[in-house]
A protein has these predicted regions:
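The feature encodes the CheY-like receiver
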Residues: 45, 57, 75, 87, ...
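Conserved acidic carboxylate
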Residues: 9
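Hydrophobic residue at a beta-alpha junction
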Residues: 32-33, 56-59, 68, 77, ...
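Charged docking surfaces used in two-component/phosphorelay signaling
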Residues: 16-24
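Acidic, metal-coordinating helix/loop segments flanking the phosphotransfer/catalytic sites
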Residues: 31-49, 66, 92
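C-terminal output helix
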Residues: 107-116
Length: 122
């Protein structure tokens, strides 16, 4: 059975780029455009890992991560923040919200895959 990744990203082009980067893997990809969509997707099918953009419409990534991590049944899902806001303190804010890791945009396929594999082997 392949492992599932939920990609939460409001920009369709960025979702496509990530999907293309993961196309040669065995991961099953699900997508959401915002935090509310992420919560709905998780309720339908629990992912093994979440790639979460932080700057999202409707419900931002910080709020979505906090809600996910507040649920004891979802606490073990690794969440990697993926954001173009690579400012000082952004990684700290992401981790404080409950993200397990952080990848600043732009990133290479190699960098993203290495980060994903780090959590998928657990």
């Amino acid at each position: 059975m392949s492992k599932r990744i939920l990609v939460v990203e409001d920009q369709a082009d960025n979702r496509r780029i990530i999907r293309d980067m993961l196309a040669r893997t065995d991961y099953e990809i699900t997508e959401a455009e915002n935090g509310e969509g992420a919560l709905a997707a998780i309720a339908k099918q629990r992912p093994d890992l979440i790639l979460m953009d932080i700057q999202l419409p409707i419900m931002d990534g910080y709020t979505a991560v906090s809600r996910i991590k507040a649920d004891p049944g979802l606490l073990s899902i690794p969440i990697i923040a993926v954001t173009s806001y690579a400012l000082n303190g952004e990684e700290k804010k992401a981790r404080a919200a409950g993200c397990d890791d952080y990848v600043p945009k732009p990133f290479s396929p190699r960098q993203l895959l290495a980060k994903i594999r780090q959590y998928m082997v657990r």
